């Protein structure tokens, strides 16, 4: 669940959040978002305890309200995941395009919203999708083990970046200013981040989706969800602070991905 919550957004979006809301306001907003998600986690924990089956929201809505409610709620949830899959599938290509712009700019297909799309990007994104599809088909044990090691590696990298930032040449607490966007004020600055927080924590609900495969008591689900959300919130806050005190506001506005 932690690995699903933390994706490319935690490394790409802190600069945008700081620019829109200010550093501390962004950190507060993303923390409030986690607390709101925990309320949903309470519901999931109670449902898993009563319905320890796989399927997540689909199974719960079907068992509680019948096929029609389950049909519509599950499709709306599916549409949400389709958006996330599209973003994650193109994230690696997007990162390569930013780091090595000349390498992927071959075979231009079209321009949308001022962004050029190349066939090389699509090939890379498709290859990664097929790779992870194959891993998923192999079974939960294989994919679960890989995700576990990926999460460990990500936590180590985040901690190294955060604590290493204290020794960076650009480190300065004054760079955190303004703590909140001056024109918008604290309330609006925080609410703007709270509004996008549900997207930032998408994925924590994958724990209930595999409840039937648990080798522990279902009542532990709530604790797992809460711990995952708190860990994800901590990661977001660390990346916001890391970005904030290592970059001035001017650099933030000129760089695409200041983090």
What function would you assign to each model-found segment?
Residues 1, 27, 66-79, 125-126, ...:
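Select transmembrane alpha-helical segments in multipass membrane proteins
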Residues 1-12, 199:
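The first (N-terminal) embedded transmembrane alpha-helix
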Residues 10-113, 228-234:
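Extracellular loop-to-transmembrane helix junctions
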Residues 27, 103-120, 148-259:
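Helix-loop-helix junctions that connect adjacent transmembrane segments
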Residues 33-36, 128-136, 155-165:
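Hydrophobic core segments of alpha-helical transmembrane domains in multi-pass membrane transport
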Residues 38, 45, 88, 92-95, ...:
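Transmembrane helix-loop junctions and nearby membrane-interface residues
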Residues 48-49, 72, 127-153, 210-213:
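Membrane-water interface regions at transmembrane-helix termini and the short interhelical loops
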Residues 49, 56-63, 70, 145-148, ...:
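Short amphipathic alpha-helical coupling elements at transmembrane boundaries
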């Amino acid at each position: 669940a932690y690995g699903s919550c933390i994706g490319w957004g935690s490394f790409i979006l802190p600069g945008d959040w700081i620019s829109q809301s200010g550093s501390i306001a962004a950190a507060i907003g993303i923390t409030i978002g986690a607390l709101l998600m925990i309320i949903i986690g309470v519901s999931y924990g109670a449902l898993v305890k009563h319905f320890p089956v796989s399927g997540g929201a689909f199974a719960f809505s079907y068992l509680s309200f019948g096929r029609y409610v389950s049909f519509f709620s599950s499709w709306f949830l599916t549409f949400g995941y389709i958006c996330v899959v599209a973003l994650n599938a193109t994230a690696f290509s997007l990162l390569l395009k930013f780091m090595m712009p000349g390498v992927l700019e071959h075979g231009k297909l079209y321009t949308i919203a001022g962004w050029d799309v190349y066939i090389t990007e699509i090939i890379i994104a498709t290859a990664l999708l097929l790779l992870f599809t194959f891993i998923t088909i192999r079974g939960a044990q294989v994919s679960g083990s890989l995700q576990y090691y990926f999460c460990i590696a990500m936590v180590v990298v985040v901690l190294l970046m955060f604590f290493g930032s204290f020794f960076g040449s650009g480190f300065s607490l004054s760079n955190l200013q303004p703590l909140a966007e001056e024109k918008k004020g604290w309330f609006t600055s925080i609410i703007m981040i709270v509004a996008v927080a549900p997207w930032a924590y998408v994925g924590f609900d994958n724990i209930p989706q595999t409840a039937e495969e648990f080798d522990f008591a279902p009542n532990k689900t709530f604790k797992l969800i809460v711990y995952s959300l708190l860990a994800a919130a901590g990661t977001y806050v660390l990346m916001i602070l890391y970005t904030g005190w290592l970059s001035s506001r001017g650099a933030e506005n000129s760089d695409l991905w200041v983090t």
